[in-house]
Each structure stands twice: as structure tokens, then as C-alpha cells.
Amino acid sequence: MDHLPLSDIPMLVSTINFLLRDEIFDNLDQICYCFNVEREEMDRLLASQGYAYQEKFNSVK
């Protein structure tokens, strides 16, 4: 995968949770770094559709 589906938020959530669940990345910060997306921008995109990264569960809900 060479980019995240930033324009399709439900697909973005699914992709992030897949990458975290399969332990490809340890947390959202690592995903943002790898795909060159600012964490603040990622949080804004997720929040625009009512989603947020939950560190306690290491997933987006």
C-alpha cells in the first residue's frame, strides 16, 4: 500500500484498523509518519465523520 484512502473516510477507518489489528503498525502516529500525513490532519479527517482514534483500544471508532 503506497497511500491511505484519505478521501473515503469509512475506508480510511477500515484501513487504519486493519493495519493496527494485524500489528503492521503499533499506533496511529506510526501510520501517519509512514504515509506522510500530519497527525492533526488525520484527527480532523476522522472527526469530520464522527470517528476518533482511541489509544486505549488502539483502534478508530
What are the functions of these language-model segments?
Residues 1-25:
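N-terminal acidic leader/helix
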Residues 28:
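Helix-turn-helix DNA-binding elements, focusing on the entry/boundary residues of the two helices
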Residues 31-32:
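Short alpha-helical "recognition helix" segments of helix-turn-helix
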Residues 37-50:
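Short acidic, Pro/Gly- and aromatic-enriched capping/linker segments at domain boundaries
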